[in-house]
Amino acid sequence: MNLPKQLRAVRVYSFTSCLRLTDAVWVALLAARGFTLAQIGLAEAVFHLTSLLCEVPSGVAADLLGRRLNLAVSAVFEIFSDVTMAFSPNLAAVCAAMALKALACTMISGTLEALTYDSLKTAGRENEYLQADAKISVLQKLATALGSLASLLSDVLQFARFYLANAAICFCSLLAALTLQEPLVTEAQAARQQNPFADIAARLRVHITDSAAVLRTAPLSVRLITADAIISLPSYLTTMFVQQRLVTLGWDASWLFVSPLLASAAAMVCTALARRLHPGKLRPLYRLCALVCGGGVLLAGAGPAWGCLVGPMLVQASLSVWFLHAMQRFNDAIPSDRRATLISVDNMAYSVLMIPASPLIGLIADVTGLAGAGLCALGGLVLLSALTLPRRK
């Protein structure tokens, strides 16, 4: 394997898959079409329900059939999602598009990290994963920041054109996926390369049994999965509901890019700085990151307009630091043959919490008439997780 070429392809795929022109304005776009925050929260819940159902199966598919194939299929589903959303006439169609988007995201999550780690491992350079992941993370956040600038085009693109432009970008992701090579670390992976579907039923049974055994015998991985799920809750919900809060504070939709742009910039800076950190234990790091994250959510939900800018910056900055080190420890603790599956379990735990959290936060906002009320409740939950973190026995 040509490792530099492989990593370049991974970076291109990471960048284009995160260059979403609608993420900074999709709530405002749907609200402008007459959807309530509770309905939008329901659509988001459909996204996470689909993620919950498909997260682990997609990880299993990546481990048994190939990570490169998973990434290519993800881009195809993303294209279908954007086209469906572009021409969605009602809430049912919006929910269908969100389900397709969730399916695309599950095909990426776990798969991209596993492919990157094992690509390095084939060259005996897995100790460089932290640096490689940091570069990928910076590119992803740069793409997110650039995508948020698309809100400036809200008067030009309108609803359908936003999503059709997304579909064109996703086609570039598909091309990048097709240039990747499948990393073969173990004998099982080499055998799979010859015939991915050979003895698939027997391999699936063994894979599920062995993956469950890893979770039983690696308590660190279980603790990391739990911590990741809790601290991740504000990641998207803050971005989502700050959009409508800024609108209620008098902001024009064309300026909604400012908040996610600043948040992405903060995340990029903190990711670069976090590479220089070498925490001996993750417990104090989690407590610090959760305190900063929860405080940022409270600021975004209860503060003035500037709080809607600073709050998401604190959220994304703290999450960038936490996940850079948490994923390094998690990858070190799990085997290559089960890597995508177990990372998918980590992501599934997040979806389990997001299914009730998303519509509940929207409902709190609708009932109270305050767009930031749900965010305040969420911020309190994250702060509580930091303050009540149990001691390791």
Report residues per predicted region.
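C-terminal transmembrane bundle of multi-pass solute transporters/carriers
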Residues: 44, 240-393
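Cytoplasmic helix-loop-helix junction between adjacent transmembrane helices
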Residues: 99-141
